[in-house]
Design a protein with these regions (language model features):
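Short secondary-structure boundary/capping segments
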Residues: 20, 40, 94-97
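Short acidic (Asp/Glu) patches
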Residues: 34-35, 47-52, 83-93
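Short, surface-exposed beta-strand-loop junctions and turns on beta-sheet-rich folds
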Residues: 36-38, 57
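Short beta-strand segments
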Residues: 1-34, 42, 50-53, 64
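Short beta-strand segments in beta-sandwich/barrel cores
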Residues: 4, 28, 48-50, 69-70, ...
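A short beta-turn/loop motif at secondary-structure boundaries
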Residues: 12-13, 56-58, 98-99
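Charged, gly/pro-rich active-site loop segments
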Residues: 61-118
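Structured helix-beta-strand junction loops
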Residues: 1-2, 45, 88, 110
């Protein structure tokens, strides 16, 4: 399963949730909705953390990333990420959206740590 967990916050209160993601151009891209806690937190505080991991007993592999988040709502970059998500995820094909209906969040890594990866 390709899922990660994103952490955002405001007023020093953390919020963590599972998300689908794409890793491209040295960034992590996720889709969200305007009415989510994640989006409202990012509007107030652009810093985010994300964990991507695979867990098998004795073979845990993970990367933890902290970075700055850019909101992508329209234009060529929106279209590029939407096309990638559309091809990759069934849930996007079942419930499509257009520009300004739901944004993408682009997490640009500033710090990272990993284990179990070569």
């Amino acid at each position: 399963m390709e899922e990660a967990r994103i952490a955002t916050s405001h007023d020093s209160i953390p919020h963590v949730k599972p998300v689908s993601f794409v890793f491209a151009e040295d960034s992590i891209i996720i889709a969200t909705d305007y009415d989510t806690r994640t989006f409202s937190n990012i509007k107030l505080n652009s810093k985010a953390g994300i964990v991507i991991d695979i867990y098998k007993s004795g073979e845990h592999k993970a990367v933890c990333i902290q970075g700055e988040t850019k909101i992508i709502e329209e234009g060529k970059e929106f279209k590029k990420w939407y096309d990638i998500f559309y091809k990759k995820f069934t849930w996007v094909r079942k419930d499509p959206w257009t520009e300004k209906e739901a944004p993408f969040l682009k997490i640009i890594p500033k710090n990272k740590v990993s284990w179990g990866l070569t």
